[in-house]
Amino acid sequence: MERTLVKSPLNYSGNKFRIIDQIQQYFPDNINVMVDLFCGGMDVTINTEAEKHYANDINYLVVDIFREFQKHSLDEILDYVDRTVAEYGLSDTNQEAYNKFRDNYNKTKYPLDLFILICYSFNHQVRFNSAHEFNMPFGYRKGLFNFNIRANLINTYGRIKDVEFSTKPFQEFDFSVLSAGDFLYADPPYLISCATYNDGKRGFTGWGEQEERDLYNILTELSDRGVNFALSNVSEHKGQKNDILLDWVSDRGYFIHDIDFDYDNCNYHALNTNLPTREILITNYPAKSLKTYSLW
């Protein structure tokens, strides 16, 4: 019986829900241990079956939401959300209530309050300043803890109870949890795209060529140990090519799988908007697909 896809209750930047069926066709079967190295909003973790899940992300504020979910029953979480929404008068038109609630969260940093804030923020998006204060504006007529988000929370809850979370820089993750035949998925910031976390000005480590090379070195070492990996990335974006990525794939003989996805809704104003973006999944193992080939 096919497993039902579940959407995370967080609309995390770069989430893979819309393409999860595409990338999962290239995942190994019968996964024992899975590591999601840049777990973000958890869409990949909660939709991938494994005997044991590890989920890591440097953004501890978001990870703490899921950790807080693990501490409480589902009824307790939903009751807290409903009571808090009523107490503050949160709605999709009450900007004053939103701003007051945001100020309160930035003082207390209670994870469930952050979850509620995200529900009422512009496009349900997540953003912090360099002091780790939530600074997304109000989502007028667009923000609400609605039926869909409630359903996503309910469906996600049962899939995270046994996940082991961590908030380390990816270089410091304990890869000893992985043995030959285990699986790692990596969806890092994309070096040549518009991700807001590439600039390193929001309180978390930025992403540049050094981080890119560090990740490839780690994946190479894991591959040499017999660990399977899948890496999401873009090889081409608005006239730029990620030569570091392509050279590494070519040198190692890894496999490229094309993914159909549109990044035109990037938050940044970009030139050359008519130039293509090529979303790819790289694996260190072959998969049967017409869209699969090796540069080696």
Where are the predicted features?
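Short loop/turn elements that flank and shape the SAM/SAH-binding pocket of Class I
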Residues: Q171-F175
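Class I S-adenosyl-L-methionine-dependent methyltransferase module
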Residues: E49-K161, P286
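A structural motif corresponding to the C-terminal end of an alpha-helix
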Residues: I149-E164, Y216-A230
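Class I SAM-dependent methyltransferase Rossmann-like catalytic core
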Residues: M1-D29
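Class I S-adenosyl-L-methionine
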Residues: S250-W296
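Mobile active-site "lid"/loop adjacent to the S-adenosyl-L-methionine
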Residues: S130, F134-R141, Y190-E212
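Conserved proline-anchored active-site loop of SAM-dependent methyltransferases
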Residues: I23-Y26, M34-T48, K52-Y60, F115-F122, ...
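Conserved Class I SAM-dependent methyltransferase catalytic core
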Residues: R213-D262
